[in-house]
Amino acid sequence: VAAVDVPVTLKMRLGWDDQMINAPELATRAVASGICMITVHGRTRCQFYKGAADWGRVRAVRDVIHVPLVVNGDIGCADTAGLALARSGADAVMIGRASYGAPWLPGLVAGTVPAGAMDIAANGLVSDHYEAMLSFYGAPLGLKQARKHLGWYLTTLECDPAPRLRTELMTATRPERVLELIGCIFSSQPLSRTIIGKDGKAIRHNDGLAA
């Protein structure tokens, strides 16, 4: 921590396994070394992503540190965020995998999405994100980086295109063709009609995708 002139934060799990829950001890040492914020995922290392995150066990970390505490794991809507905060005593939540293909989700959970922002068409949002990635990474790397996001969007927005269209979307090397496919595959309906409420769940749509 002393080697840099920027704030240093730490993310950890509850411990190695149920027999070694050492997050409180590690958090105490981290704060003593100068760590300014700690995030705890409510599973052990050995759980990977199996089972449910135990937000209540994060409270033991809250009891021993004074720096901001963030709780993470299985948080995907305002209700689960509220429960995680209540059970852990944390100051904030971190949304992870639930935001894959749903970049609007943190804003919905926090209640900070501007009025009208969800009126953008689903295919418009995906196109904007795709072009932003190409602009940031450049064409060769951006094309590859974008593919995982396109896959997540297909899942989150419950798009089920014909296999040949899905394959072409995930393998096309010309950005112009990818944008054409996005316009064809993803709904032209506003996100406010494509997803349901604060949970960010999708309504299945069929905009001529059987081709």
Language-model segments: what does each one mean?
Residues 3-5, 19-37, 49, 56, ...:
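Alpha/beta catalytic cores of nucleotide-metabolism and tRNA/nucleoside-modifying enzymes
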Residues 1, 10-12, 28:
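Conserved beta-alpha-beta core of the PfkB/ribokinase-like small-molecule kinase fold
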Residues 10-14, 42, 71-73, 97:
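A cross-domain feature marking catalytic cores of carbohydrate-active enzymes
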Residues 40-50:
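Glycine-rich, proline-tolerant flexible connector loops at the mouths of alpha/beta enzymes
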